[in-house]
Curated annotation (Swiss-Prot):
Superkingdom of source: Bacteria
This protein's UniProt keywords: Ribonucleoprotein, Ribosomal protein
Function text: This protein is located at the 30S-50S ribosomal subunit interface and may play a role in the structure and function of the aminoacyl-tRNA binding site.
Stated name of the protein: Large ribosomal subunit protein bL19
A Pfam family recorded for this sequence: Ribosomal_L19
Gene Ontology, cellular component aspect: cytosolic large ribosomal subunit
Keyword Magnesium in annotation: no
Species assigned in the record: Alkalilimnicola ehrlichii (strain ATCC BAA-1101 / DSM 17681 / MLHE-1)
The keyword Zinc-finger is assigned to this record: no
MF terms in GO: structural constituent of ribosome
GO biological process: translation
Annotated InterPro entries: Ribosomal_bL19, Ribosomal_bL19_CS, Ribosomal_bL19_sf, Translation_prot_SH3-like_sf
Similarity field: Belongs to the bacterial ribosomal protein bL19 family.
Length: 117
């Protein structure tokens, strides 16, 4: 193991506790630190995870929501210090790893059924 991989592992271990297990189709709420002027505050972003990219410290996930009839997507770096917490609101039952087809859909056709345990 080279020194870069070792540093990545240490950084990931420090941030691991705040991130629960989730995947595509899950509805999550991400609490993000936002800087406005001279002050910082927490902002919630709730939506469906449409993609997840697992690349060690460079891991990321994309969350999509519809706000005022307009689709909004945001890509979060999984181990970023601006992410305060991630909460899974509901588990979705999907058969794909990337749910990009939801971009073309709206209304009832964009719904994802809930996973039954």
């Amino acid at each position: 193991m080279n020194i870069i991989e070792q540093l990545d592992k240490e950084q990931m271990a420090a941030r691991e506790a705040k991130i629960p297990e989730f995947g595509p189709g899950d509805t999550v709420t991400v609490q993000v630190w936002v800087k406005e002027g001279g002050r910082e505050r927490l902002q919630a972003f709730e939506g469906v995870v449409i993609a997840k990219r697992n690349r060690g410290i460079n891991s990321a996930f994309t969350v999509r929501k519809v706000s005022h009839g307009e689709g909004v997507e945001r890509v979060f770096q999984t181990y970023s210090p601006i992410i305060e917490s991630v909460k899974v609101k509901r588990r979705g039952d999907v058969r794909r790893a990337k749910l990009y087809y939801l971009r073309e859909r709206s209304g009832k056709s964009a719904r994802i059924k809930e996973k039954v345990k």
